[in-house]
């Protein structure tokens, strides 16, 4: 694998010897110019240059739409086939008949799968910055199912309203019948679909590094440039972060499939480096994606599921609430909102939300809702900034090419 793409390295060396006005370009001046351009782009953010950022964001959208329109125009047969298939599906969906029961069942499953796969992609695709959808969506869903399972002594929640809302079935099980495996089985589809989405979201770094290696070009991607610098200074790396990155790179490069599987299975912030490494050393696509899919959708998801289920099991939650109440001085005041929140959840599970005391908004749920709103807004802002910086990069590349032709 290490020898893969040897010709690509030679081609890159040749391309680095660019000639400008009859003289070879000084590598240090080229690197300095790239650094200045990168700093200029990093300053194009909404809180520093709002008008320019919004202008570049709009222009980048227009450029992307133009590129996709051109691509679709050159693939008219595929577009026509897709439109015909879409017309058949729409007709099947709206025409009355005995098939509607199957259509509704397929629609329900499709929307469920698409929802969780989409959240998984958003979590790792890195559009500006990843949206932490496990903490915001999947983790709370698993926690809610866990708390409900112990309260209802069953996981056979009525559908509908499950999964949108969880209520106890009319006939619950006996105390102590809920097992760890039954809860794992209940949330398996949601967790696996989310894991598949995260695996799909890891593909951009792989394709970027692979395309750069095959073409010999050097993409202006910070993570990829950091990866190349790390390879150049591998022997002099001293700090822990650099050694950890080198360990991941060597594991993936030498072990291959099982190295990628190990990196994907263990929650770690360095997996993007594994994708870049696989692309750079031209690891076959199915070797990379297969190991990533198995690691993230099966092994890692079961680790995360078990952790959340154990953390939110009935006796652990009761112990945590009791521990909060034991804090000297402020314990009882901190314990009260947790107790109110848990009691409100129990009432909802047993159809008692409209009965008894008026339902005031608990500050825990209020804070979590606001946290979700803030993180989603930050995610949207990061996308706007990232796309605006992409357009600024287009301008810089055009100016550089004009300078070379003079």
From Swiss-Prot:
Residues 1-36 are annotated as: Disordered. It is found in: Endoplasmic reticulum-Golgi intermediate compartment membrane; Cell membrane; Vacuole membrane; Endoplasmic reticulum membrane. The modification N-acetylalanine is found at residue 2. GO terms for molecular function: phospholipid scramblase activity. One of its GO terms (biological process) is lipoprotein transport. It catalyses: a 1,2-diacyl-sn-glycero-3-phospho-L-serine(in) = a 1,2-diacyl-sn-glycero-3-phospho-L-serine(out); cholesterol(in) = cholesterol(out); a 1,2-diacyl-sn-glycero-3-phosphocholine(in) = a 1,2-diacyl-sn-glycero-3-phosphocholine(out); a 1,2-diacyl-sn-glycero-3-phosphoethanolamine(in) = a 1,2-diacyl-sn-glycero-3-phosphoethanolamine(out). Residues 21-30 have a biased composition (Polar residues). One of its GO terms (cellular component) is phagophore assembly site. Residues 173-316 are annotated as: VTT domain. Keywords: Acetylation, Autophagy, Cell adhesion, Cell membrane, Endoplasmic reticulum, Lipid transport, Membrane, Transmembrane, Transmembrane helix, Transport, Vacuole. The chain crosses the membrane at residues 44-64, 78-98, 110-130, 251-271, 274-294, 306-326, 364-384. Residues 2-43, 99-109, 272-273, 327-363 are cytoplasmic. Residues 1-20 have a biased composition (Basic and acidic residues). It is a multi-pass membrane protein. Residues 65-77, 131-250, 295-305, 385-406 are extracellular. Belongs to the VMP1 family. Phospholipid scramblase involved in lipid homeostasis and membrane dynamics processes. Has phospholipid scramblase activity toward cholesterol and phosphatidylserine, as well as phosphatidylethanolamine and phosphatidylcholine. Required for autophagosome formation: participates in early stages of autophagosome biogenesis at the endoplasmic reticulum (ER) membrane by reequilibrating the leaflets of the ER as lipids are extracted by ATG2 (ATG2A or ATG2B) to mediate autophagosome assembly. Regulates ATP2A2 activity to control ER-isolation membrane contacts for autophagosome formation. Interacts with BECN1. Interacts with TJP1. Interacts with TP53INP2. Interacts with TMEM41B. Interacts with ATP2A2, PLN and SLN; competes with PLN and SLN to prevent them from forming an inhibitory complex with ATP2A2. Interacts with ATG2A. The VTT domain was previously called the SNARE-assoc domain. As there is no evidence that this domain associates with SNARE proteins, it was renamed as VMP1, TMEM41, and TVP38 (VTT) domain. This is Vacuole membrane protein 1. It comes from Pongo abelii.
């Amino acid at each position: 694998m290490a020898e893969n793409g040897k010709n690509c390295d030679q081609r890159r060396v040749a391309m680095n010897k660019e000639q400008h006005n009859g003289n070879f370009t000084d590598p240090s001046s080229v690197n300095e110019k790239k650094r200045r351009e990168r700093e200029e782009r990093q300053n194009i953010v909404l809180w520093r240059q709002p008008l320019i950022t919004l202008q570049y964001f709009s222009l980048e959208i227009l450029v992307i739409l133009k590129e996709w329109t051109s691509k679709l125009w050159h693939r008219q047969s595929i577009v026509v086939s897709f439109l015909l298939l879409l017309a058949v599906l729409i007709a099947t969906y709206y025409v009355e008949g005995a098939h509607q029961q199957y259509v509704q069942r397929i629609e329900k499953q499709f929307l469920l799968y698409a929802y969780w796969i989409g959240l998984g992609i958003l979590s790792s695709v890195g559009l500006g910055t990843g949206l932490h959808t496990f903490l915001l969506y999947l983790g709370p869903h698993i926690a809610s199912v866990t708390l409900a399972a112990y309260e209802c002594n069953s996981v056979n929640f009525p559908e509908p309203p499950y999964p949108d809302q969880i209520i106890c079935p009319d006939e619950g099980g006996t105390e102590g019948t809920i097992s760890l495996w039954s809860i794992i089985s209940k949330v398996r589809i949601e967790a696996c679909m989310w894991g598949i989405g995260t695996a799909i979201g890891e593909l951009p770094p792989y394709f970027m590094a692979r395309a750069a290696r095959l073409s010999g070009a050097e993409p202006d991607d910070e993570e990829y440039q950091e990866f190349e610098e790390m390879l150049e200074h591998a022997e002099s790396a001293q700090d822990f972060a650099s050694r950890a990155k080198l360990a991941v790179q060597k594991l993936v490069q030498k072990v291959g499939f099982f190295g990628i599987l190990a990196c994907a299975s263990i929650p770690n912030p360095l997996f993007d480096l594994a994708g870049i490494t696989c692309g750079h050393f031209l690891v076959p696509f199915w070797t990379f994606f297969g190991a990533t899919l198995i690691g993230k959708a099966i092994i890692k998801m079961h680790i995360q599921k078990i952790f959340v289920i154990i953390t939110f099991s009935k006796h652990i939650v009761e112990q945590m609430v009791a521990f909060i109440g034991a804090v000297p001085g402020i314990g009882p005041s901190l314990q009260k909102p947790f107790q109110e929140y848990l009691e409100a959840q129990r009432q909802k599970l047993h159809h008692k939300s409209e009965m008894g005391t008026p339902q005031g908004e608990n500050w825990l749920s209020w804070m979590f809702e606001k946290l979700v709103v803030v993180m989603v807004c930050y995610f949207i802002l990061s996308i706007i900034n990232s796309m605006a910086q992409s357009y600024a990069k287009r301008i810089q590349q055009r100016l550089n090419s004009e300078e070379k032709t003079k």
